[in-house]
Amino acid sequence: MRKLRVEEMGRLTVEEFKDAEKFPFVVVLDNIRSLANIGSFFRTADAFRAQKIILCGYTQSPPHREITRSAIGAELSVAWEKNERPVDAVMQLKADGYQVWCVEQAEGSVMLQNFQPQYEKPCAFVFGNEVEGVADEVIAAADGCLEIGSHGHGTRESLRRQPSLARRVRTPARSVAAHRAMYVRLTK
């Protein structure tokens, strides 16, 4: 057994990725302050072929050296846009037919393992500030909140941001029954 070389992995070029069909989800970043976290979101969005990332509030945007350091080139392939007000981004997504879910601990939140999205509608996942979380007005405008269980006493919210995106999108992306048509098109 040996590790594959990069050229053996069949990865898309930046141009091919931009033209490739994407999975029907968007990532919304609500005032993320860490540039390394922003870059990590770009890498995760690239890995799961997100439609785009919406950078809201004071969330910094590429090009930026610290974002590039953790994005490792994904900031060049993933579409992104800037919106100063996170709630405006959420309202526009809802008007465009998206179901919007905040990744946050809130009253009535759905545990991640129990989440059943409406597969006929695209999803938007909102991730909040590392300290304050998702803004209350954004939670009020969303369709609901997803909660990721934590078992440690001192678990930091920021620690769970990028892994939660990967966990959230992995299930529908791997569900052949729910995404059969897209799966077939993406693997041709």
Language-model features and meaning:
Residues M1-K188:
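Post-transcriptional modification and biogenesis factors for structured RNAs
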